[in-house]
Amino acid sequence: MNEQFRVAQKLGLMFRPETPLPEDIKSWAISQLNAKSPALGIKSFKSMNSDIKEWPRELQPNLKKRAEMWTVYRANRKKEREKIDGQETEAAKRANEHKNLMGQKDSLKFSHRNVYGQDQLKIRFMSFWANHFTTGNIHDNQNVIGHLIDEAILANLNSSFSEMLYKATSHPSMLTYLDNIWSSGEDSVETREQRRNGRQAGLNDNLGRELLELHSVSPSAKYTETDIRNAANVLAGWGTDLERPLNEMREVANTTDHWDLYKRTWAQPGVKRVMGKTINQGKGGLRELTDFLAMHEHTISYLSSKLAQHFVSDNPSQSDISYIKNAWKKGSGNLDQIHTAVIERAILSKEPKFQWPMTWLFQTIRLSNATFYMG
């Protein structure tokens, strides 16, 4: 295997037949970090290479439109159960799913990106971070997972890890998947009012736990259950049900932006302490927390090791990990600098690298110029 293909197999998705091989593979690889990233694909299963085009804008709706589509879908499902307006017919059911659900469309767009994209290294880093910030394809979350990947992950690959951590944590997909949209502080107005009326309410620590355990410092930091609950209290009040009417969103949070919705009456009053860091009360507390975690020594060590194992070697050396850690610290978490360090160590290492089955499939399709995914 020549050097161009070795590097593309290790760090990218392999060269498509119409793509000329770069002479300077290292410069090419680093330049890929700032490549343009349109969602490329094909219209039909019979399409040729000349037919590769950007996905239509109507198939890449914004967050507000996705919430509207989900609300319509749920309303039609209610009519289906009640046998109203013909929604119980098989044709109506299929039409409702096709028109208003985004899960399958987003999945196909992701596959098309990987097969037809010209930014193969950037896509690999997008996939790495999308896996790191995994959310499940359940219930109303299916309409917003693709938006998280495109707008919280891909759109921030040239930013900082601090920015990506904040954007991923506060995204409706993450808040919905881990039930933070129902979490209220133990001493919040919402919790007291609901309990007075005999209803359940209170803190859900799912996201607070994952934020520490999986997304940032890892268990090596030896945080406590108190740290987890305090992180959850910082997150209390963030997010809302996608079906919530816009007038209610304005009333409870003075916004109709699902990605910036903070319900003050659900928030835990007072300052919080997470791993020794004092976090102020209010909406800005989440940014304080994610900024602190993004540059924590344990986060840097954990994620530098994870990046090295994914891209450099199945058993990365301490020098590989230290090289990435130093880039993280020197650039204050700048992802371009972190990813450049990963590329440099991956090229330097001659060890073969195990690939995810998904990555292997995309590489095989690109190399063979096969048409595997429908348009």
Regions found by a protein language model. Name each.
Residues 121-125, 137-144, 176-179:
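Short, flexible active-site-proximal loops enriched in glycine and acidic residues
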